[in-house]
UniProtKB/Swiss-Prot annotation:
It is an enzyme of class 2 (transferase). SUPFAM superfamilies: Protein kinase-like (PK-like) (SSF56112). Signal peptide: none annotated. The gene is ccrZ. Plays a role in cell cycle regulation and chromosome integrity. Activates DnaA-dependent chromosomal DNA replication initiation ensuring that the chromosome is replicated at the right time during the cell cycle. May regulate replication initiation through phosphorylation of a possible second messenger or metabolite, and by interacting with replication initiation proteins. Has ATPase activity with D-ribose and 2-deoxy-D-ribose in vitro, but not with choline. Involved in DNA damage response. Monomer in solution. Interacts with DnaA (via domains I (1-82) and III (111-326)). Interacts with DnaB. Interacts with FtsZ. This is Cell cycle regulator CcrZ. GO terms for biological process: cell division; DNA damage response; DNA replication initiation. Its main location: cytoplasm. Changing F240A: No effect on activity. It comes from Bacillus subtilis (strain 168).
């Protein structure tokens, strides 16, 4: 159900201009008035308040409950830009991700919201079901699944943290005053930090630079971490393949298959 534009107008006042923020759900809007700009969203998680307090997302201005029970949140709309792929190898990204992964406040809130730590075995079972559902039996995918099965016992890691689970460069915003934010937290999980580190390093950082990037993040590149990162980026790639196949996104499906081909060569080399 979309946000009621008339209700928003009454909430903010007639002086505010309100327009959709994009996306198919109708759940997000921009509003502006006298140089002030807000980003409005319906039914954001209570997690947003902690992310705002920690300085990880743009500041939460207010939260209001609508007559139908929906909750609208308003955040400062930041003027700035998305990061470019080349920006992802820099220190600011490493330091912000480290801040997220070591935040007790974020972890406590996700636990209060009922999130359970991700189990790699359960993730692999879901992945195999998704592949079976789209009848995708390509030898390359089966090779990838075999790798995940063979190394499952090696990826159990005790220290679970809050993971964003979609660290694509499009989700990192750099404001005009050089403040970095990570947005779009709908898929956040309690998991092995390698779930974020793997996709980020494999997609954005040259392999010879992994050690120096992880040094900025604050840890060493161990063989255990190397394996866990490979495991999670591989599982993510196969999940994307099954998802695009199910949606009938032919171009994205073939692109993901090519990515899997390259990834398997990198992992086994």
């Amino acid at each position: 159900m979309n946000i009621d534009m008339n209700w928003l107008g009454q909430l903010l006042g007639s002086d505010w201009e309100i327009f959709p923020a994009g996306g198919a759900t109708g759940d997000a809007y921009y509003a502006k008035h006298n140089g002030q700009q807000l980003f409005l969203k319906r039914n954001s998680s209570p997690f947003l308040a902690v992310l705002s307090a920690e300085g990880i997302v743009p500041k939460l201005v207010w939260t209001k409950r609508m007559e139908n029970g929906d909750v609208i949140t308003a955040q400062h709309w930041m003027t700035g830009r998305e990061l470019k792929p080349k920006d992802m190898s820099g220190r600011p990204v490493a330091e912000l991700l480290r801040k997220i992964h070591t935040s007790k406040a974020l972890l406590d809130m996700l636990k209060r919201l009922g999130k359970e730590p991700l189990n790699p075995g359960a993730l692999l079972s879901q992945l195999k079901q998704a592949v079976f559902a789209v009848q995708q039996s390509s030898p390359l995918i089966q090779e990838g699944i075999k790798y995940l099965e063979e190394h499952l016992h090696e990826v159990h890691f005790g220290e679970k943290v809050v993971c964003h689970c979609d660290v694509n460069h499009n989700n990192w915003l750099l404001s005009e005053d050089n403040q970095l934010y990570l947005i779009d937290w709908d898929g956040a999980m309690i998991a092995d930090p390698a779930m974020d580190l793997g996709p980020l390093l494999y997609h954005y950082v040259e392999k010879p630079a992994w050690e120096s990037w992880l040094s900025m993040y604050g840890i060493e590149l161990t063989e255990s971490l190397r394996l866990r990162m490979a495991w999670y980026v591989l599982s993510e790639t196969i999940t994307f393949i099954a998802w695009h196949k199910a949606k009938g996104n032919d171009k994205e499906f073939h692109d993901a298959m090519e990515e899997l081909h390259i990834l398997m060569k990198r992992i086994v080399d």
